[in-house]
UniProtKB/Swiss-Prot annotation:
GO cellular component: BBSome; centriolar satellite; centriole; centrosome; ciliary basal body; ciliary membrane; ciliary transition zone; cilium
Subunit structure: Part of BBSome complex, that contains BBS1, BBS2, BBS4, BBS5, BBS7, BBS8/TTC8, BBS9 and BBIP10. Interacts with PCM1 and DCTN1. Interacts with DC28B. Interacts with ALDOB and C2CD3. Interacts with PKD1. Interacts with CEP290. Interacts with DLEC1.
Domain of life: Eukaryota
UniProt xrefs under SUPFAM superfamilies: TPR-like
Residue spans of biased composition, Polar residues class: 8-18, 448-473
Source organism per UniProt: Homo sapiens
Record note on what altering residue 61 to K does: Found in patients with Bardet-Biedl syndrome carrying mutations in other BBS genes; uncertain significance
Family the UniProt entry places it in: Belongs to the BBS4 family.
Keyword Protein transport assigned: yes
Identification of the protein by name: BBSome complex member BBS4
TPR repeat spans: 67-100, 101-134, 135-168, 169-201, 203-235, 237-269, 270-303, 304-337, 339-371, 373-408
Location, primary (coarse class): cytoplasm
Tissue occurrence: Ubiquitously expressed. The highest level of expression is found in the kidney.
Entry's Gene Ontology BP terms: adult behavior; B cell homeostasis; brain morphogenesis; centrosome cycle; cerebral cortex development; cilium assembly; dendrite development; erythrocyte homeostasis
Amino acid sequence: MAEERVATRTQFPVSTESQKPRQKKAPEFPILEKQNWLIHLHYIRKDYEACKAVIKEQLQETQGLCEYAIYVQALIFRLEGNIQESLELFQTCAVLSPQSADNLKQVARSLFLLGKHKAAIEVYNEAAKLNQKDWEISHNLGVCYIYLKQFNKAQDQLHNALNLNRHDLTYIMLGKIHLLEGDLDKAIEVYKKAVEFSPENTELLTTLGLLYLQLGIYQKAFEHLGNALTYDPTNYKAILAAGSMMQTHGDFDVALTKYRVVACAVPESPPLWNNIGMCFFGKKKYVAAISCLKRANYLAPFDWKILYNLGLVHLTMQQYASAFHFLSAAINFQPKMGELYMLLAVALTNLEDIENAKRAYAEAVHLDKCNPLVNLNYAVLLYNQGEKKNALAQYQEMEKKVSLLKDNSSLEFDSEMVEMAQKLGAALQVGEALVWTKPVKDPKSKHQTTSTSKPASFQQPLGSNQALGQAMSSAAAYRTLPSGAGGTSQFTKPPSLPLEPEPAVESSPTETSEQIREK
């Protein structure tokens, strides 16, 4: 029995560990970043209220020393539009971590959004000292210099950004600089490189197509716009531009089909309704044209091109008082355009205000040094008032402009203007050999003459950050001459592109030019 007891004791030894004294638990120190994962999770889910609640709790625990919580709260403030508050929080982050280039970049970004571009440049330069190979710093420095109109420094910074890392947005801003400087060729070169780098970027393709459209290179314009629509069939900018090209060539029904697609995407677009209205004008549906143009004017009341077109349509409908109203409004916004004064003079002539019509014609002649139609209409008015000497002077000035256009271009004059000038020349006894009449190439075409419109090199770009064109025409009011009709002209104005890749930004095509015949 004793042996069994010994074996039992040997088989089950008594543990000595339980007899040792238990160690105390290590003290828990607050971890500043322990809630960062939860803050990040709420932020990327855009659950900002829950995110701010966690941030508040985290900052209370850490006594305001959690850098990430402050950083995310500053981002939320910026999204909510509280730029000044976000700036102060980002500055706090920069104090907590002075060697972080990201914090300085965010401080500079907030300064930029507040319009303090010089201060933003200083902070970006400090960030560049901490990280010299960050393309974003160079890009944003270039953007700041653009707003300060220091284009040379802006180009240097943007080129530096492209050397560090190529991005679509950098190409777009570099192209914007060339557009601001009026150098379309360099802008096209930049956008061509951008398209080579990013061939599926519809914004780049559309902008490049619009630049070619502005230069009158329709084949390349249509090619790039077509590529943009291939990648994005609902790209309303490209559709609007393509419709504008069709409208320019007189395909009004096809253009309206294109615009119907755009109307679903952007039903409140002023350029869209302007172009639709001028399509109806080309189809001689004047009531529909006025309705669409009135809607465009409601959406963009300060756009002078819409007012111009409204005046033009009312002139066509012989509603001269309404035409005077819209043309006067257009002149208030664009006081340096001679064609506006010419059409205003036509309206005044038909309203029997001859003295003011003469003043308007005189201003048109002073402002427009290239369009012979201004001088022709002025000569007609003077002839009808019995001032043959002054009428002859205007007629001779018209012939000089025609000769200049004939030497510099091969565009066509409208046959009605040719006929009217011949009648006036005969009445003034100077019309035996007009310098600008050419033989007709085939019986179906108009007279092969130089154009009544100015060549592209003489024209002022007519667009804004959207697609707006114009129907450039004129009407000479005859009373004593038997024809009783005025000259017409056809203009195709190039578009002016938006300066930034923003919705407002928005590059847009120009619209077609139409004709007006005023009896």
